[in-house]
Curated annotation (Swiss-Prot):
GO biological process per UniProt: regulation of DNA endoreduplication
Lineage, highest ranks first: Eukaryota, Viridiplantae, Streptophyta, Embryophyta, Tracheophyta
Induction: Up-regulated by double-stranded DNA breaks-inducing treatments. Up-regulated by DNA damage.
Keyword match Transcription: no
InterPro entries noted in UniProt: SMR (IPR040389)
Molecular functions per Gene Ontology: protein kinase inhibitor activity
Gene (name only): SMR4
Protein name per UniProt: Cyclin-dependent protein kinase inhibitor SMR4
Annotated signal peptide: none
Protein keywords: Cell cycle, Protein kinase inhibitor
Length: 72
């Protein structure tokens, strides 16, 4: 008879939320800091020992056109 009473009590109470610590949401922990950028190692390069290469026909490739005047 006790089994029938328990089922009846459960049916009357309805659904309930579990309250055990096993079912609780854990407390939020502190997030780790964001990753840092790597430091850029800037090293000034020395000019080449033999100097820079200057081809004799460089001006023919990069011809500078004269600027046009605006019409007024």
């Amino acid at each position: 008879m006790e089994v029938v009473e328990r089922k009846t009590e459960m049916a009357e109470e309805g659904c309930t939320t579990p309250r055990s610590t096993m079912y609780r949401i854990p407390v939020a922990s502190v997030c780790p800091p964001p990753p840092r950028k790597k430091l850029m190692v800037v090293r000034k390069r020395d000019p080449p020992r033999n100097g820079y290469f200057q081809p004799p026909d460089l001006e023919t490739l990069f011809y500078a056109q004269p600027r046009r005047e605006a019409c007024a």
